[in-house]
Amino acid sequence: MFKKNNMVIIDAHSHLWLRQDTSWDGKPIRSLKNGRSIFLGEEVQMMPPFMIDSQNSAEVFLSNIDYAQVGAAVVVQEFIDGLQNDYLVTVQKQYPDRFLCCGMPDYRQPGFFAQAEELILQRGFRGIAIPGHRLLGKPLTDDEMMRMFRLMEQKDVVLSITLEDGDRQVGELAEVSSECPRLRIAID
């Protein structure tokens, strides 16, 4: 592990995937080659062109953070990358000292708590990611979210959340932290 002045530098927001194959708002997001992707229907350069297979794999990421003398990384998820739980659970097992990987249930579906419970209890994720800016108005304080936060607090699972613009979710997150005072929350 790299240390600088006896401190370990941690990348607190990173993404890994073997391929992007999803859609958002009815528009496709797909990996191509040479770091290019179809993103919301438009071909764009998503990654450096030397990443010819368009994978942002743990091994490629580790080579970059090793070069930058970064000791570890928190891996979050985003709907626009597609759910990466299957890949990230293997990364977490293979590199437990280098990555804290966050699982992500599909919050857009009713009954997502069962997915969250599986990610935490059976698959062993140490964090859960919420792309709050993509919840389409769903409150952080709804019953299912609060059940998930209570489970996370009980199992000492970190919440990594990106908040939407404005202050609505700030107040909601204050309610969450009041109800679950031992829940560890990382906001980006």
Regions found by a protein language model. Name each.
Residues I52-S54, Q77-Q84, D106-F112, L135-T141, ...:
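Acidic-and-aromatic substrate-binding clefts and catalytic sites of carbohydrate-active enzymes
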Residues F61-N64, Q69-V91, P96-D106, A129:
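Short, well-structured secondary-structure segments
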Residues F2, S57, Q84-Q94, G111-R123:
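Catalytic alpha-helical scaffold of carbohydrate-active enzymes acting on polysaccharides/glycoconjugates
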Residues R126-G127, P139-D188:
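Catalytic pocket-lining loop regions of alpha/beta-barrel enzymes
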Residues H13, I65, L88, L119, ...:
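Conserved, mostly hydrophobic/aromatic
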Residues L100-L136:
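Substrate-binding cleft of extracellular glycoside hydrolase catalytic domains
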Residues M1-Q77:
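An N-terminally biased module of ancient metal coordination in phosphate/nucleic-acid-related enzymes
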Residues I10-S14, A73-V76, L100-G103, R126-I130, ...:
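Hydrophobic faces of well-ordered beta-strands that scaffold small-molecule active sites
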